[in-house]
Amino acid sequence: MNMYSMPGYFQNMPTVGKALVNPNPENEQELKAVENDIHESIKQALDAGITTEEKLNARGQLSATQRINALIDPGTWCPLNSLYNPEDNRFQTTNVLNGLGRVNGKWVYIIASDNKKMAGAWVPGQADNLLRAADTAKMLHLPLVYLLNCSGVEFPNQDKVYPNRRGGGTPFFRNAELNQLGVPVIVGIYGTNPAGGGYHSISPTILIAHKDANMAVGGAGILSGMNPKGYIDEEAAEQIVNAQIENSKHHVPAPGSVPIHYDETGFFREVYEDDLGVIEGIKKYINYLPCFNLEFFRVDSPKAPQLPAEDLYSIIPMNQKRPYDIYDVIGR
């Protein structure tokens, strides 16, 4: 396009910020030391887990990082909440990776279960991290994409996962709210997802599954709600056990498997043979969505700042009591 009105005004607007006169190498060194410490902490959190990327690949699976990289356009990943760990979990995270990325040129918000850490189990603080992601998608009106591989709730810490206003149930309410607002929630589902990992069928717009994916509820409290009596007693438990024995004789599909959710319930919109197939399915549905065109509100072609960004290491002081000119920051 590059044909904008009032070029004499917008292309000759006054600049802000002054050239750096006195570099501060000591301040630069202190800031870069903090940056390096943050980068190292993020690396340790990403590397932590009970399995490795190599072992996952040997089993025919991709890691969360590999799935994200396969989904997004190269160089567009903007990770967020990388060190968020409000409950001090042992792997230094909440077992999910999330952030912004472009898929075929369109920005989306991505949440990926970290399958190196307890197969992506729900741990304390994860629900709040999911809400941070969903709230950002809501605010920016971006599609929310899950790469789900969740082994359910970490049992010893159930009391820290489910309760609370921003606890285990709220992300599902938020997903439903996004649907009502016209913000799609698209889920690619891998592996076995019992209990808390299986509830994502309740609220997403589209579910795309790996052929070996499984998604089912679990726990006596949940099963009791599915029983006509409203609770589980010895008789009901015996019925469940006997049904499992009988089903095993007739090769009835396991609860939550692809034959159930693709052929019967319709929760799975599409099923693919491998990890990358699921990614391609997600991309297909992203392509169906409209995209905001930056040209709509542009008044001039974007340009890099006139002043070098490297100057910020000298301008922004480590000593927070020292003043600085915010226009010098804006100018870079």
Where are these regions (language model features)?
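Conserved catalytic cores of soluble enzyme domains
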Residues: N2-M3, N12, K18, L148-L294
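Generic, well-ordered alpha-helical scaffold segments in large soluble proteins
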Residues: S41, L71, A133-T136, G281, ...
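Short acidic (Asp/Glu) and glycine-rich catalytic loops that position anionic groups and cofactors
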Residues: A48-T51, V258-G266, K303-Y313
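Charged, compositionally biased N-terminal leader segments and the immediate start
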Residues: M1-D47
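Terminal amphipathic helices with adjacent charged low-complexity linkers/tails
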Residues: F10, E270-I326
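Long, structured ligand/cofactor-binding scaffold of large enzymes
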Residues: E54, A58-I186
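Short coil/turn segments at secondary-structure boundaries
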Residues: G49-N57, S82-N85, L294-S301
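Amphipathic alpha-helical
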Residues: L56-L83, K303-R332
